[in-house]
């Protein structure tokens, strides 16, 4: 009997902040980046690094998307204070998270999910709508 591969043990990606299922990533409009991504209904943004080797670029892209495209603002955000993040191994063909190991895995894509933490002094607003 064949053992299941890591890919088959994956699970459909869900937002860790609201629990909703994440849509399939697609080409993001309004950005020159080729990295696919999308946005959750709660305002969290994610970008997929298909090679698993451009993590810094993917995280910066996700932060810029979360800031509405304001790259200057996104460069000064600090994890834990300004945003929450989740980095997970991802299979783009099956649209599944691949659990069971951490770190770089040759040929495995990575999904970078970011949600901004509202500042305590800011008025409570609804989720940021996706860019048009």
Where in this protein do the model-derived segments appear?
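A composition-biased, non-transmembrane "mature-region" signal
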Residues: 4-6
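Residue-level signal for mature regions of secreted extracellular proteins and peptides
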Residues: 8-11, 33-35
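Short cysteine-rich clusters marking metal-coordination/redox-active sites
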Residues: 15-19, 39-40
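Cys/His-rich microdomains that often coordinate metals
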Residues: 19-24, 44-47
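Short linker/helix segments within small regulatory modules
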Residues: 26-37
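Short metal-binding segments enriched for Cys and/or His
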Residues: 41-61, 67-72
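Long, contiguous alpha-helical scaffold regions
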Residues: 70-132
């Amino acid at each position: 009997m064949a053992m299941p591969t890591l890919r088959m043990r994956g699970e459909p990606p869900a937002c860790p902040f609201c629990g909703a299922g994440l849509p399939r990533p697609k080409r993001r409009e309004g950005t020159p980046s080729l990295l696919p991504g999308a946005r959750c209904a709660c305002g969290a943004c994610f970008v997929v690094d298909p090679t698993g080797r451009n993590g810094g670029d993917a995280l910066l892209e996700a932060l810029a998307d979360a800031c509405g495209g304001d790259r200057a603002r996104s460069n000064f955000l600090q994890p834990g204070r300004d945003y929450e993040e989740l980095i997970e191994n991802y299979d783009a063909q099956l649209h599944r998270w691949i659990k069971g190991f951490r770190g770089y895995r040759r040929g495995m894509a990575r999904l970078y999910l970011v949600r901004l933490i509202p500042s305590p002094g800011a008025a409570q607003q609804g989720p940021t709508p996706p860019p048009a």
